[in-house]
């Protein structure tokens, strides 16, 4: 009976999302407007609650709809961020007014979660330099991390769009602390090579590489050029939230030369899942590792997945094995 109810719930959800996709696709523009805001609010409201749906197992027609919807979400998100970035730039000190962005608190909570996961699972000194790939015109994540959690760290923000970087840089013009630690670069991650080796942590935005194969290529490229021991933070999605953002398979992260240390699926207003991984020193040419090597091949569902609340004690028990359990349990918070 439960399975039957789940199937009905999934079918109803897919039908609703399909209708919203059709309505959004008919909009003359995805720039912020009452109609755009109303439809995307309805979409997010439908996707955020816990759901039994596994979007990776939907049929071809639903998959095509989902892929198109994610592209629309990406375009709308870019226009929304550009709109608010321009609004903020009109202030003498834009960083004093970030709260006008309606989802700013979500970035605060997401960045806090990512910081705490890094602190618990990556045993190293405070990072000297961090890269954020896909920073966009509103680099809230870098700002929150720099201002609240990593006061001495330098941040290099990368985006394909030069206009997005121009907008972002204007937000920091009046700040002599965080602004001095922020730099913006217009580049495709595929064109970065030796630069990647200087970062202690690399953040990969959810919409960099929207198709699964593109995301896997980006991760493999990072694995080929990041320094051994450097951390990778990947934003993904879970359940119905996979209609909004791409879902990253931890196997692709393992095949890319990383060891997956933890996965967290929030069930609150933080929409993105977070995957913490570390570049392994024990990766062979075929992408496979040994011992704790990054190439460990995880079957779907056997990766250290932690459902909310993301309690670190439970995460340690899930992630570690044998003597590593004690090593992580006794580790000091380094970040």
Curated annotation (Swiss-Prot):
Keyword flag S-adenosyl-L-methionine: yes
Single annotated GO MF: nicotianamine synthase activity
Keywords: S-adenosyl-L-methionine, Transferase
Pfam family name, one: NAS
SUPFAM superfamilies, sorted: S-adenosyl-L-methionine-dependent methyltransferases
Entry's EC annotation: 2.5.1.43
Domain of life: Eukaryota
Example of a GO biological process term: nicotianamine biosynthetic process
Keyword Nucleotide-binding belongs to the record: no
InterPro entries to which the protein is assigned, alphabetical: Nicotian_synth (IPR004298), SAM-dependent_MTases_sf (IPR029063)
Catalyses which reaction(s): 3 S-adenosyl-L-methionine = nicotianamine + 3 S-methyl-5'-thioadenosine + 3 H(+)
Function according to Swiss-Prot or TrEMBL: Synthesizes nicotianamine, a polyamine that is the first intermediate in the synthesis of the phytosiderophores of the mugineic acid type found in gramineae which serves as a sensor for the physiological iron status within the plant, and/or might be involved in the transport of iron.
Family of this protein: Belongs to the nicotianamine synthase (NAS)-like family.
Protein name (Swiss-Prot/TrEMBL): Probable nicotianamine synthase 3
Protein's organism: Hordeum vulgare (Barley)
Gene that this polypeptide is encoded by: NAS3
């Amino acid at each position: 009976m439960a399975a039957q109810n789940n199937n009905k719930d999934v079918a109803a959800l897919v039908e609703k999302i399909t209708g919203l996709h059709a309505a959004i696709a008919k909009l003359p523009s995805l720039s912020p407007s009452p109609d755009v805001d109303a439809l995307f609010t309805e979409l997010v409201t439908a996707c955020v609650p816990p759901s039994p749906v596994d979007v990776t197992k939907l049929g071809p027609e639903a998959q095509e709809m989902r892929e198109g919807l994610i592209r629309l979400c990406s375009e709308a998100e870019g226009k929304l961020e550009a709109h608010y970035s321009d609004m903020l730039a009109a202030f003498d000190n834009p960083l004093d007014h970030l709260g006008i962005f309606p989802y700013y608190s979500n970035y605060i909570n997401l960045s806090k979660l990512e910081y705490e996961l890094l602190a618990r699972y990556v045993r190293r000194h405070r990072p000297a330099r961090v890269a954020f790939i896909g920073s966009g015109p509103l680099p809230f994540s870098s700002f929150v991390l720099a201002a609240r959690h990593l006061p001495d760290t330098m941040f290099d923000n990368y985006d394909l769009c030069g206009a997005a970087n121009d907008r972002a840089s204007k937000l920091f013009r009046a700040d002599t602390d965080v602004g001095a630690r922020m730099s913006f670069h217009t580049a495709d991650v595929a064109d970065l090579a030796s630069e990647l080796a200087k970062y202690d942590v690399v953040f990969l935005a959810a919409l960099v590489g929207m198709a699964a194969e593109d995301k896997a290529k980006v991760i493999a490229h990072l694995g080929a050029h990041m320094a051994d021991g450097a951390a990778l933070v990947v934003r993904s999605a879970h359940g119905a939230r996979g209609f909004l953002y791409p879902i990253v398979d931890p196997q692709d992260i393992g095949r890319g030369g990383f060891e997956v240390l933890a996965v967290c699926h929030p069930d609150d207003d933080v929409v993105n899942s977070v995957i913490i991984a570390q570049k392994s020193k024990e990766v062979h040419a075929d992408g496979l590792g040994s011992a704790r090597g990054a190439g460990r091949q995880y079957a779907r569902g056997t990766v250290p997945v932690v459902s909310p609340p993301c309690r670190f004690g439970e995460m340690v028990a899930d992630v570690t094995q044998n003597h590593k359990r004690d090593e992580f349990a006794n580790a000091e918070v380094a970040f």
